[in-house]
Each structure stands twice: as C-alpha cells, then as structure tokens.
C-alpha cells in the first residue's frame, strides 16, 4: 500500500490510475471486481478507484482524486486516507495514531503531510482506547507528532481518499487521545430584532388603546350630561354599564317629551286658526252694529247703550 502511494506521488508530480485497474495481479478475483461500474459506487466522474481483495477475499477499494492545484505544482502529499470494506455499513470510528513519524518521512513533503483516517467501528471497536463510533464520521488529522480532530473535507476541494484494510494501517502505530477542535464553530450572535408580527401586534395594541380612550371620554361626557349620573359619580365611581343604561333611559324620556310637545304644538296651531276666524267674525259684527246705529239716527231715534254693570 505504501509503495503504491509513493509510486503514485513521485512520478512527474501526477497521479495516474486507470479506472477499473487491478491493484494486485496475484488475485484471480480482482479482474471480476474491477468490472464493477463506477456509477454504482461514486456518481462523481472525477473520482477514480481501484478494487482489490485482501485477507480471505474481503473486498477493499482505493479511491484517488487529484485536484487541479496539485497538477499546477502545489504541494503534493496533502490528502486524505480512509478505509472501510465495501460490504459493511457506513458506521465509522476513528483510530488515533494510524500513521507514525517513521511512516511520515517516506516522502519529500513528510513534514507537512496530512492524513485523514476513517475506520469501520466493527473492525476496530474492540480494545481501542481512543476509538469513537457512531453514525457520524470523525476524522483524525495527523501532522508529525500531533493529532487533531477535524471534519472531513468534501472531494470538491481536491483531496484524495485511499481505502485500505485496517490491518495495514494499524501495524506499528500507537493510539493517542483525540484533542478537541482547534477552531470550534461559533454561531454569530445577532442582536434581538423586532419581527414583523411583533410590530403588527404593537401597532394593533396602539390602535386599540386609542379606541378605548375615545370610548372612555365619550362615556365621561355622557355622565356629565345626564343629571342623575353627574351626582352619583361624585359620590362613588360609576360603572360604564350604569352610565350607558341611564343614558338610554334619559334618551327615551327625551323622545317621549318631544313627541308630547309636538302634539301640543299641533293643538296650538289649530287654536290659532280658530282664534283668527273668531276675530274676523267680531270685526264683521262691529261693522254691522255701526250701520244700524247710523240708520237709527237718520230716523231721529236715539240709541241708549245700557251698561250691564250698572
């Protein structure tokens, strides 16, 4: 495995592995394994892989991806190494110290070389003090003698992943404790902002408060207009319902009084007409009386007017 990695990294700074090639020619089953279509395992066309059998016919596979930065002359050796059988579940555990300092000096860029190691929990879950297992994937970053816990970088960043058996990785490596992340994720603390619903609620409350104030003012004015309420309000607090009830009674009384006054006004109008007719009749009688007196004087008769009071 280590020799394959060196050969891939030292030949003119590029890694060239044909899709479906067999890593070990000794296994007769490798040819059948290499015929598996790439779309079934890795839908990304940029990922190349090689299948091989190991330890009793268990299928292991190696995936290599070269970024454009490495082809342009960037530092080689930066990559990710991960391994798990193709037939097992994806539940993985982290094994610390998978690469020792002796393994790291085999290449020219060993001082800055970074490895990300993945292992299935079923293969390394027994007797591992620094092993963690779960549905999520943990990553051990090994740089020289220090080990840091980080997250796996997606393949789009250009790193490559090498899958191998756990026995090849664990030989000669001592386990170390996993350190926490150097740069923990800290969500941005935003100042509390008033949401649209809160603004709408505050505006609605303000409108309701103004409406209640207006209603209270009108009720106070009614209590001042109604005679009974004005006296009771000075003695004890008058309820709004009592004020409105007395206001309704007072309005009913006013309506009845107005109706009665309208009827009396109609009677007065009729009396006025009768009075005018009587006055006209009195005037006519006076004129006739004067004519009769004039005729009596013409005939030599004197008219003596007797006073009833005498």
From Swiss-Prot:
The covalently linked position for Glycyl lysine isopeptide (Lys-Gly) (interchain with G-Cter in SUMO2), per the record, is 306
Keywords on record: DNA-binding, Isopeptide bond, Nucleus, Transcription, Transcription regulation, Ubl conjugation
Q: What is its main location?
A: nucleus
This entry carries the following GO cellular component terms, namely: chromatin; Golgi apparatus; nucleoplasm; transcription regulator complex
Cell compartment(s), UniProt = Nucleus
Which positions fall inside the bHLH domain?
199-254
Q: Where is the composition biased (Polar residues)?
A: 1-17
Q: Which Pfam families match?
A: HLH
Q: Where is this region: Disordered?
A: 1-26, 171-209
| A GO molecular-function descriptor | protein-containing complex binding
**PANTHER family found in the cross-reference section:** FI24210P1 (PTHR46117), UPSTREAM STIMULATORY FACTOR 1 (PTHR46117:SF1)
- What is the recorded name of this protein? Upstream stimulatory factor 1
